[in-house]
Amino acid sequence: MTQNILFVGGAHLERSVRQRLEQNGFAVSSVSASAPAIQVLTDSLIDLVIVHLDERQNGTDLIRQVRHVLGTKTTGVLAIADWGTGLPSVALAAGADAYEPAPIVPERLIDAVKRVLHKRATVVGMNK
């Protein structure tokens, strides 16, 4: 079964990263801002939200909104941010399941995506 990923952030999701995720069986969509992300989340079945944080946007508010809108649904949240900015800690405190440092390295991102999805499935008893 294909798992759906929503990438949110001002930073452009590189074509090579998208292709690598798709080659690993993930369907990837992307939006650049919080408002369309919340709309996608309410209208679609999304398994994982990847939020690319930077200091110009308040992606941590999006993480809180995702948790509020989805409640106890199984959707995971993975934050990407530059180390040393404090954003990784803030993202985890806001409800992100995991953090990956920027810049995005495809292999590392794929491993993180799989870990978060596995963890979320285990939490809700879907992974036997």
Report residues per predicted region.
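Two-component/phosphorelay signaling modules centered on CheY-like receiver
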Residues: 11-30
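Acidic, metal-coordinating helix/loop segments flanking the phosphotransfer/catalytic sites
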Residues: 32-48, 55-56
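Conserved phosphotransfer cores of two-component systems
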Residues: 42-44, 67-73, 94
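Conserved phosphotransfer microenvironments
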Residues: 47-70, 84
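Alpha4 helix (beta4-alpha4-beta5 surface) of REC/receiver domains from two-component response regulators
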Residues: 61, 83-99
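A short, hydrophobic beta-strand element within the central beta-sheet of small alpha/beta folds
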Residues: 73-86
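C-terminal output helix
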Residues: 104-113
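The C-terminal output helix
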Residues: 114-128
